[in-house]
């Protein structure tokens, strides 16, 4: 009997197995991973990504930007982490007041000469105080105001001024003695700071009548 590993005429030659061929896919996968990693490293160099820094402005080209923030600021604006201010719905401000009864002199009106209104038609934001008939600006911005103060069966000339923080800004007159009803009317755009106050003041004459004809209105055109 020949010894193990021995043939009839000499030692047997061992043939190499085919296990080495099974390693080729693993070697190929490793090479592919290395190539992909290299491409990822080279990508920023060939295709730079624009990022914001302290000096570069944000450039939006044909894209919509949606900013959400659950903590709006006190003036109704929402400021994102990118420093972009977005006005919320609470930034809407408008009022319009009228009278439901005739203008009658009172101790308060004789002392302050303020023209009072007793009915609010619109008061978005509740920044017009009916008791004092004073509007208080909730934020800095450009505001529009208009007024129509009617005198009825009164031959005296009246002068009505729109007051900002106690100082007259514009005035209107009604003094035609040949008509029974006449209105002192005017309008203006004002730059107002937060908590600035606006009201109407009778600078001259007396107010009698004017039931439901006198109005005072204003609204925020845009905030600053």
UniProtKB/Swiss-Prot annotation:
Disruption phenotype: Mice show impaired synaptic transmission within 3 weeks in interpeduncular target neurons whereas significant decrease in both the synapse density and size seen only after 3 months. Display impaired passive avoidance learning, spatial learning and short-term memory. Double CBLN1 and CBLN2 knockout mice exhibit gait abnormalities, impairments in balance and coordination and develop seizures. Synapse density in the hippocampus is normal in 1-2 months old mice, but severely decreased in 6 month old mice. Residues 1-51 form the signal peptide. InterPro entries: C1q_dom, Cerebellin_Synaptic_Org, Tumour_necrosis_fac-like_dom. GO terms for cellular component: extracellular space; glutamatergic synapse; synaptic cleft; trans-synaptic protein complex. Changing residue 53 to Q: No effect on its ability to form homohexameric or heteromeric complexes with other CBLN family members. Increased interaction with NRXN1 and NRXN3. Total loss of N-glycosylation. The keyword Signal applies. Residues 88-224 form the C1q domain. Glycans are attached at residues 53, 110. The keyword Disulfide bond applies. Its main location: secreted. Pfam families: C1q. Expressed in various brain regions with higher levels in the olfactory bulb, cerebral cortex, certain thalamic and hypothalamic nuclei, superior and inferior colliculi and some brainstem nuclei. Highly expressed in the dorsal medial habenula. Gene3D superfamilies: 2.60.120.40. Keywords: Disulfide bond, Glycoprotein, Secreted, Signal. GO terms for biological process: maintenance of synapse structure; positive regulation of synapse assembly; spontaneous synaptic transmission; synapse assembly; synapse organization; trans-synaptic signaling, modulating synaptic transmission. It comes from the Eukaryota. It is found in: Secreted. Acts as a synaptic organizer in specific subsets of neurons in the brain. Essential for long-term maintenance but not establishment of excitatory synapses. Functions as part of a trans-synaptic complex by binding to postsynaptic GRID1 and presynaptic neurexins. This interaction helps regulate the activity of NMDA and AMPA receptors at hippocampal synapses without affecting synapse formation. NRXN1B-CBLN2-GRID1 complex transduce presynaptic signals into postsynaptic NMDAR response. NRXN3B-CBLN2-GRID1 complex transduce presynaptic signals into postsynaptic AMPAR response. Homohexamer; disulfide-linked homotrimers. The trimers are assembled via the globular C1q domains. The trimers associate via N-terminal cysteine residues to form disulfide-linked hexamers. May form homooligomers or heterooligomers with CBLN1 and CBLN3 prior to secretion. Once secreted, does not interact with other CBLN family members. Interacts with GRID2, and more weakly with GRID1. Interacts with NRXN1 and NRXN2 long and short isoforms produced by alternative promoter usage. Weakly interacts with NRXN3 short isoform and not at all with NRXN3 long isoform. This is Cerebellin-2. It comes from Mus musculus (Mouse). The gene is Cbln2.
């Amino acid at each position: 009997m020949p010894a193990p590993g021995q043939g009839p005429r000499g030692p047997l030659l061992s043939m190499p197995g085919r296990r080495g061929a099974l390693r080729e896919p693993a070697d190929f996968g490793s090479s592919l991973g290395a190539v992909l990693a290299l491409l990822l490293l080279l990508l920023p160099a060939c295709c730079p990504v624009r990022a914001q820094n302290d000096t570069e402005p944000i450039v939006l080209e044909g894209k919509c930007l949606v900013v959400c923030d659950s903590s709006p600021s006190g003036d109704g604006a929402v400021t994102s982490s990118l420093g972009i201010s977005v006005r919320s719905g609470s930034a809407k401000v408008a009022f319009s007041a009228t009278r439901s009864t005739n203008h009658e002199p009172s101790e308060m009106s004789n002392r302050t000469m303020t023209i009072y209104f007793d009915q609010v038609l619109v008061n978005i934001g509740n920044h017009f105080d009916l008791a004092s008939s004073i509007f208080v600006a909730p934020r800095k911005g450009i505001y529009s105001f208009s007024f129509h103060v009617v005198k009825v069966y009164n031959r005296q000339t009246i002068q009505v001024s729109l007051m900002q923080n106690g100082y007259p800004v514009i005035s209107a007159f009604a003094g035609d003695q040949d008509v029974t009803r006449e209105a002192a009317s005017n309008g203006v755009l004002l730059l107002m700071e937060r908590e600035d106050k606006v009201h109407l003041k009778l600078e001259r004459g007396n107010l009698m009548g004017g039931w439901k004809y006198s109005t005072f209105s204003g609204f925020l055109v845009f905030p600053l």
